Amino acid sequence: MKAMEKDWYQKNWTLDIHNMSWVEDTNRQVDFLINQLQLKGTEKILDLACGFGRHSLEFARRGYDVTGIDITPAYIDYANEQAKKENLNAKFICQDIRTITFDKEFDVVLNMADGAIGYLEDDGENHKIFSVIAKALKNGGKHFIHFSAENLVRHSRAGMNAA
């Protein structure tokens, strides 16, 4: 992500995370994911563009081994503090998701609330995310994308088809 774009993102997306109405839906959303993905509780989960870790933390509370990645330092700091405070099996890494290098380590990869897909400069950047996902998933792994606003997801189709 270019410096100017990263600065814009930090300024406009670092919000008061505790006063978001959608935070209340987290338990219901995790229940839905467990049901739809037919999870058993032993899966290793990667949450891309995890924000402050609301889904990651809830999965960890339910016994899953979770890794969350986000580019916003304040969100990652908060998520790591919560995981430590609650003694959860979750780790959070501050990094651009296009640059992570996992190799068939995860049973599930999540892109919740778009997970950065469609917010990037062009289809090539979206393709990088799908390449990361393909490399991170174990054989037979599952990928779930939640598109929160179709009109915000400009470039997702080409990336999905190319991965």
Set out the residue ranges of the language-model regions:
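A short acidic, Gly/Pro-enriched loop at the edge of an enzyme's catalytic core
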Residues: T101-V108
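A conserved beta-strand element that flanks and buttresses the S-adenosyl-L-methionine
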Residues: L110-M112
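Class I SAM-dependent methyltransferase SAM/SAH-binding core
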Residues: S56-T99
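Conserved class I S-adenosyl-L-methionine
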Residues: M1-K40, T42-G51, K142-A163
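A short glycine-rich, Lys/Arg-flanked "PGG" loop and its adjoining helix->strand segment in the class I
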Residues: E125-N139
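A structural alpha-helix within SAM-dependent methyltransferase catalytic domains
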Residues: I34, L57-A60, N80, F130-A134
